[in-house]
């Protein structure tokens, strides 16, 4: 991001000047007036030719004189020792190129465009075979020294490094590449030359280079890249731009091509990073837990003298501005003022990365590290994403006081991001949306479509889901439909709002019936999944909490598990152990798919488009078939009604079932390699199948399916009305629609048909048989889940209250009755057993009607 006062063409023309004063702009005024006048003329576009590389155009005397000899007007300039014209960032481009294109500027990428590489200082190059005094002299040509000229502090020879990388680009073919993984790429041709062709077509000036490929091509080049990325990557930029613009001279890009290496084999976990990794290229993996707002970072400061109006520019070195002490034109001290709207800025974002749970040692808390993303990498990741980050590990000193320049001996570390990669081989659709479209080759898509035409594809996919868990086919089918999800519908433009597409499932039953294993399997399968436990979760841990940003010291919102699993699945184990305040936050998320926050002056509404997969155990440690679902797990009916499917996972007391289950469990311990490999292949097909359907198939209801859904809902209501009970609510109809859409996705169908509605009805009916059956009558009563009480229980409660009223009236005008005596009288009068709880409920019902009041052990009439 640059100021409005400077345009790309003006910047590029300034970079293209012939003399090596690019890093000495603050000393331009020391030269004679003729020199300044000539500099002003050059800014109008009349650029003198400069050599394009150390080995090109250096033999001609004009080029040598222009590059290595100072003009007469510059003899008075004091050239600092850390400046050398053979630095990889000082090579220019002949002025014959079109102004305004990337070729009109410096051939290597300017540091202003690569803030991720840090320092803008030019590396001093020294002669390895000369003494210290000779090293200070500017050499006439790198060719005269062969391979001996290196950047100070490294063993990087610019010409050799650039030549090796160009050979790598022009020659490398990946011998391990597979056609399925490289869609649209000829694996027999040089890989990166084909990618340059894609850059020419798409216009995206970024080349992602796999470090593993560089290592297989040249171990020395790979070592230099890992050890000295700040010096080597600009050389790579210069090499790839020369090849690209020689191959595509008419191509116009937004800026010069930037090389972004990834997959550095020096991959470490966060807790293993140590001082030896500082200023080296590393790759770490983790989960993004927070991203900051966009921060403008100054890359080049513009100063103006308040006395004589002389201006100068100063490059920013890792956030430090070298403010001029005096004006070089009028020699007035402390007269230079910073002009913000003439300075150059870049976009910057702070990202907090947390250690992945699978990389965490047992008994340890997760480590976090701060990342800084620049320019095009800003807003590329969101909280909840699992990423592999390649960047340069930095250490900066901590100031004793913000107003004092003294620093402590303790340093704080961060990573300047060069490349993100949102891939996870174990998870579904873990790539970004653009990469998803390129993930499936035509051959793979053809295979998936052939599978979708098989009549038993639904059963095949369900059996491939958690194959180690015995039976529970309907539960696996329900979870499979949850992974596919329905079609997201947005009718907000017509005033009807949004309708959720996510399916919520609750598993409840006896301990040891694989509920937690199913949750762990789903969590490891989806990319934006979160796994929490009931006792280990709080309300703010699920939603969001306010904290003070350590960088800006402002109050910011830190998101919780439900927001981090947006567009994913949130797995909640021990659902019944949650306290009431924690469960209450789920009401809005499970129906409206949003999360409203009003804390510490921060008022917002966050997206939480997540499916909830929960598991709950009964309060008596074993399921009591004589009690309803709500009585067994003690969950509020307002929450249970938001689950589309509620399954019971019971442990039947059956010897034949126990024998089959034991045989299945024992067989898991002596699987052959062929069985394991076959299971892995099934898993790969399952992941690809769901990922393709999730991203490309958006089914709509057909007329036939619409009529079938209407008939199903009306019939469900009719069955209950004949017995004076409610057997369906509009929420059940919406659940049927979502399940039918998910089943259509299983068939790769863009239209929901009657067969999908039938399967949705069957699955919904099976779940209701288990969870909404009245234990007294054995009849399905949906009001158990929606109101917390079956119609039979409600009728018995009313009858008992009426009988108690008649009993009290029959005793005459007695002002007070004993509680225990009244309880024994009503029990003796009734034909059915009456518990103390039922008696107290009847008393409360009469008290609500202002018929009586209970004080202690006495019942008084009103």
Swiss-Prot record:
A single GO BP: DNA replication
Composition skew (Low complexity), residue ranges: 1-10
UniProt KW Transmembrane helix keyword: no
Motif position, Arginine finger: 641-644
SUPFAM superfamilies in UniProt: Nucleic acid-binding proteins, P-loop containing nucleoside triphosphate hydrolases
PTM remark: Sumoylated; SUMO2 modified in response to stress caused by inhibition of proteasome activity (in vitro).
Broad EC category: hydrolase
Residue ranges, compositional bias (Polar residues): 61-71
Glycyl lysine isopeptide (Lys-Gly) (interchain with G-Cter in SUMO2) cross-link site: 438, 797
UniProt binding sites for ATP 1: 496, 642, 731, 734
Domain MCM: 457-666
Residues bound to ATP 2: 470, 515-516, 617
Modified-residue entries (N-acetylserine), positions: 2
UniProt-annotated location(s): Nucleus; Chromosome
Predominant cellular place of this UniProt entry's protein: nucleus
Modified residues annotated as Phosphoserine in this record: 6, 26, 31-32, 104, 119, 130, 141, 144
Single GO MF annotation: single-stranded DNA binding
Top-rank lineage group of the source organism: Eukaryota
Alphabetic keyword roster: Acetylation, ATP-binding, Cell cycle, Chromosome, DNA replication, DNA-binding, Helicase, Hydrolase, Isopeptide bond, Nucleotide-binding, Nucleus, Phosphoprotein, Ubl conjugation
Subunit description: Component of the MCM2-7 complex. The complex forms a toroidal hexameric ring with the proposed subunit order MCM2-MCM6-MCM4-MCM7-MCM3-MCM5. Component of the CMG helicase complex, a hexameric ring of related MCM2-7 subunits stabilized by CDC45 and the tetrameric GINS complex. Interacts with MCMBP.
Similarity comment text for this entry: Belongs to the MCM family.
Name of protein: DNA replication licensing factor MCM4
Organism annotation: Mus musculus (Mouse)
């Amino acid at each position: 991001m640059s100021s409005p006062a400077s345009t790309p063409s003006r910047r590029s023309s300034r970079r293209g000047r012939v003399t090596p004063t690019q890093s000495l702009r603050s000393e331009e005024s020391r030269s004679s007036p003729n020199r300044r006048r000539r500099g002003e003329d050059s800014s109008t576009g009349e650029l003198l030719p400069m050599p394009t590389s150390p080995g090109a155009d250096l033999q001609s005397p004009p080029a040598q004189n222009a590059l290595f000899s100072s003009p007469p007007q510059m003899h008075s300039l004091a050239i600092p020792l850390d400046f050398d014209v053979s630095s990889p960032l000082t090579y220019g481009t002949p002025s014959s190129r079109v102004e305004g294109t990337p070729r009109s500027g410096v051939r290597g990428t300017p540091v202003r465009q690569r803030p991720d590489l840090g320092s803008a200082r030019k590396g001093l190059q020294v002669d390895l075979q000369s003494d210290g005094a000779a090293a200070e002299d500017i050499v006439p040509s790198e060719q005269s020294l062969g391979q001996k000229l290196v950047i100070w502090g490294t063993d990087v020879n610019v010409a050799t490094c650039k030549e090796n990388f160009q050979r790598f680009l022009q020659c490398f073919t990946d011998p391990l590449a597979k056609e399925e993984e490289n869609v649209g790429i000829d694996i027999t041709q040089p890989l990166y030359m084909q990618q340059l062709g894609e850059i020419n077509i798409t216009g995206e000036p970024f080349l992602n280079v796999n470090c593993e490929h560089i290592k297989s091509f040249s171990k020395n080049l790979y070592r230099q890249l890992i050890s000295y990325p700040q010096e080597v990557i600009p050389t790579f930029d210069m090499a790839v731009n020369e090849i690209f613009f020689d191959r595509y001279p008419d191509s116009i890009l937004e800026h010069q091509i930037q090389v972004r290496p990834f997959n550095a084999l020096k991959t470490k976990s966060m807790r293993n990073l140590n001082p030896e990794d500082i200023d080296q290229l590393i790759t770490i993996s983790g989960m993004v837990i927070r991203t900051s707002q966009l921060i403008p970072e100054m890359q080049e400061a513009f100063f103006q003298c308040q006395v004589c109006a002389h201006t100068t520019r100063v490059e920013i070195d890792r956030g430090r501005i070298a403010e001029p002490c005096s004006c070089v034109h009028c020699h007035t001290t402390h007269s230079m003022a910073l002009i913000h709207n003439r300075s150059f800025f870049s976009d910057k974002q702070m990202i907090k990365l947390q250690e992945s749970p699978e990389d965490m040692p047992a008994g340890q808390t997760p480590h976090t590290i701060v990342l800084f993303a620049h320019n095009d990498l800003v807003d590329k990741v969101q909280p909840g994403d699992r990423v592999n980050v390649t960047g340069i590990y930095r250490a900066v000193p901590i100031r004793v006081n913000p107003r004092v320049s003294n620093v402590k001996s303790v340093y704080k570390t961060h990573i300047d991001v060069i490349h993100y990669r949102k891939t996870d081989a174990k998870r579904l659709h873990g790539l970004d949306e653009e990469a998803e479209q390129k993930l499936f080759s035509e051959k793979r898509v053809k295979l998936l479509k052939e599978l979708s035409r098989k009549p038993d594809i639904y059963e095949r996919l369900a059996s491939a889901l958690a194959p180690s868990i015995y039976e529970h086919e309907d539960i696996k089918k329900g979870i499979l439909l949850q992974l596919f999800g329905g079609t997201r519908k947005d009718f907000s433009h017509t005033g009807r709002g949004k309708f959720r597409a996510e399916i919520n499932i609750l598993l409840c039953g006896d301990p040891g019936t694989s509920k937690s294993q199913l949750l762990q399997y789903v969590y490891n399968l989806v990319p934006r999944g979160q796994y929490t436990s009931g006792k280990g979760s709080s309300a703010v841990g699920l939603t969001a909490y306010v904290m003070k940003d350590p960088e800006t010291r402002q109050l910011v919102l830190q998101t919780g598990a439900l927001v981090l699993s947006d567009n994913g699945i949130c797995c909640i184990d021990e659902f019944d152990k949650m306290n009431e305040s924690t469960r209450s936050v789920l009401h809005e998320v499970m129906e409206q798919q949003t999360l409203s926050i009003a804390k510490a002056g921060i008022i917002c509404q966050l997206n939480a488009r997540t499916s909830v997969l929960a598991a709950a155990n009964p309060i008596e440690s074993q399921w009591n078939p004589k009690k309803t679902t709500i009585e067994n797990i003690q969950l509020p009916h307002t929450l249970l009604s938001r689950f589309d499917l509620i399954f019971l996972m019971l442990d039947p007391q059956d010897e034949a079932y126990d024998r089959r289950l034991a045989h299945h469990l024992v067989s898991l311990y002596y699987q052959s390699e062929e069985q394991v490999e076959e299971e892995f292949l099934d898993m790969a097909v399952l992941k690809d199948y769901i990922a393709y359907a999730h991203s490309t198939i958006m089914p709509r209801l057909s007329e036939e399916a619409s009529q079938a859904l209407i008939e199903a809902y009306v019939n469900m209501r009719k069955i209950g009305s004949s017995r004076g009970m409610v057997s369906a609510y509009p929420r059940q109809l919406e659940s049927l629609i979502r399940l039918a859409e998910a089943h259509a996705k299983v068939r790769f169908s863009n239209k929901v048909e009657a067969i999908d509605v039938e399967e949705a009805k069957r699955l919904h009916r099976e779940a209701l048989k288990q969870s909404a059956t009245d234990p007294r009558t054995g009849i399905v009563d949906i009001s158990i889940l929606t109101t917390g009480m079956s119609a039979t229980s409600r009728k018995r409660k009313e009858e008992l209250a009426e009988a108690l009223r008649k009993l009290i009236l029959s005793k005459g005008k007695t002002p007070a009755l004993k509680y225990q005596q009244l309880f024994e009288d009503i029990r003796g009068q009734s034909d059915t057993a009456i518990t103390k709880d039922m008696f107290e409920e009847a008393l409360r019902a009469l008290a609500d009607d202002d018929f009586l009041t209970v004080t202690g052990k006495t019942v008084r009439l009103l």
